[in-house]
Amino acid sequence: MKTVLIIDDSDNMRMTIKELVELNGFSVIGEAGDGKTGIGLYKEFKPDIVTLDVIMREMDGIETLKQIIEFDAGAKVVMVSAMGQELYVKDAIKSGAKGFVVKPFGEQQLMETFKKVL
């Protein structure tokens, strides 16, 4: 079973992503509400894929991504962004993200992105 780490400062978004990925046979090995905690969980568990919110308090998604990639250049990170954040998505792809989904997204969009990344 493929493992997923969810990093998002929104409890509701973490819950939504968790439900979607578990319905599709993935195992959520960790959830983090901030980048620093997410990086620690990544280093501890080395999940198959990470969903990472672009805009978060304290440490944003781009900085979190850079630190994950610095630790593991092969990390498979899917950025989660809101409409109008396309500039951040370009930065994320340049920084090593393997994919992105735009909120609001559905199960099919998330799973298609996972399939491409994995």
Show which residues each predicted segment covers.
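Acidic catalytic/metal-coordinating carboxylates
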Residues: 34-37, 60-63
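C-terminal output helix
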Residues: 105-114
